[in-house]
C-alpha cells in the first residue's frame, strides 16, 4: 500500500498535477458559485447555475442571489456516494494556485483522521472564498452552514443565519428535515457515508474529472489533466 501511494504521488508530480495535504470544512450558502461566472478559467463553459427552484438552468451572466440577483447554486451540486467513494463539489484555496487554475479542477481526497480516516472522496472545485486559507477545501453539504453569505434566506426562506449555526450548520440528522426536500439527500449524506466527521484533515491529488461530476456542473477544464 505504501509503495502504491508513493508511485501515485510520483505520477501526479510527473504529470504536473497538484497534490498535498490540507483541511476541510463544510458549507452550503446557496449562492451562485464563483466559477459560474465567465472568464474565470479555460473551461468549456462556466459552472451551471440555477433559478431559485434549484433546477432550472439560468444564464451565467445573471447576478447572484447573494448580491440582489436571481442566480443560485443548483440542487444537484450536493454530495453523494457511488460504491465506496464519495463525490461532490467544493470551494477551495490551494497554495500557489490562483482561481484560474482551480476552477472546475477535480481532486481526490483521502481523509486522514476522524471516523472517515482512509475513506476517499472526489470533488470538483466550483467556488473560492475569501475566508479560506491555503490547501483548504470547503465541502458543499446542505445544512453545513451558510458562512459569510446567506443566499438560502432569499432562495428557500431559511433563517437569517441559515439552518443551524451560521458556521457548521445543523448538529443532528433530524434537523435535515428543516431543509427543502430537494436538499435533504445531501444533508443526510453527512450523517451517513461522511459519519458526521467534523472538519477532517486529508491528503489530496488532482485527478481527471469524472463525468459523474461534470455532467452536473457542465464545466470541464481545457485542456484537462
Curated annotation (Swiss-Prot):
Its main location: secreted. CDD domains: DPBB_GH45_endoglucanase. Disulfide bonds join 30-152, 31-66, 35-103, 50-74, 104-219, 106-209, 176-187. GO terms for cellular component: extracellular region. Belongs to the glycosyl hydrolase 45 (cellulase K) family. Hydrolyzes carboxymethylcellulose (CMC). Also hydrolyzes lichenan and barley beta-1,4-D-glucan. CMC is hydrolyzed majorily to cellobiose (G2), cellotriose (G3) and cellotetraose (G4). Cellohexaose (G6) is hydrolyzed to G4 and G2 with traces of G3. Cellopentaose (G5) is completely hydrolyzed to G2 and G3, and G4 is partially hydrolyzed to G2. Does not hydrolyze G2 or G3. Does not hydrolyze crystalline cellulose, soluble starch, xylan, mannan or laminarin. This is Endoglucanase.
Amino acid at each position: 500500500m505504501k509503495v502504491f501511494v508513493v508511485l501515485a504521488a510520483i505520477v501526479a508530480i510527473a504529470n504536473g498535477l497538484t497534490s498535498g495535504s490540507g483541511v476541510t470544512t463544510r458549507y452550503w450558502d446557496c449562492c451562485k458559485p464563483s466559477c459560474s461566472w465567465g472568464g474565470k478559467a479555460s473551461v468549456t463553459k462556466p459552472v451551471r447555475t440555477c433559478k431559485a427552484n434549484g433546477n432550472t438552468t439560468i444564464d451565467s451572466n445573471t447576478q447572484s442571489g447573494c448580491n440582489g440577483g436571481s442566480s443560485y447554486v443548483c440542487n444537484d451540486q450536493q454530495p453523494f456516494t457511488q460504491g465506496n467513494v464519495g463525490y461532490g463539489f467544493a470551494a477551495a484555496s490551494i497554495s500557489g494556485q490562483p482561481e484560474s487554475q482551480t476552477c472546475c479542477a477535480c481532486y481526490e481526497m483521502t481523509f486522514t483522521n476522524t471516523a472517515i480516516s482512509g475513506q476517499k472522496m472526489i470533488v470538483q472545485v466550483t467556488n473560492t472564498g475569501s475566508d479560506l486559507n491555503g490547501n483548504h477545501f470547503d465541502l458543499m453539504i446542505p445544512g453545513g452552514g451558510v458562512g459569510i453569505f446567506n443566499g438560502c434566506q432569499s432562495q428557500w426562506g431559511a433563517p437569517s443565519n441559515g439552518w443551524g449555526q451560521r458556521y457548521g450548520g445543523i448538529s443532528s440528522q433530524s434537523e435535515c428535515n428543516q431543509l427543502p426536500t430537494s436538499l435533504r439527500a445531501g444533508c443526510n449524506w453527512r450523517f451517513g457515508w461522511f459519519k458526521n466527521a467534523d472538519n477532517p484533515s486529508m491528503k489530496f491529488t488532482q485527478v481527471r474529472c469524472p463525468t459523474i461530476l461534470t455532467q452536473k456542473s457542465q464545466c470541464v477544464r481545457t485542456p484537462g489533466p
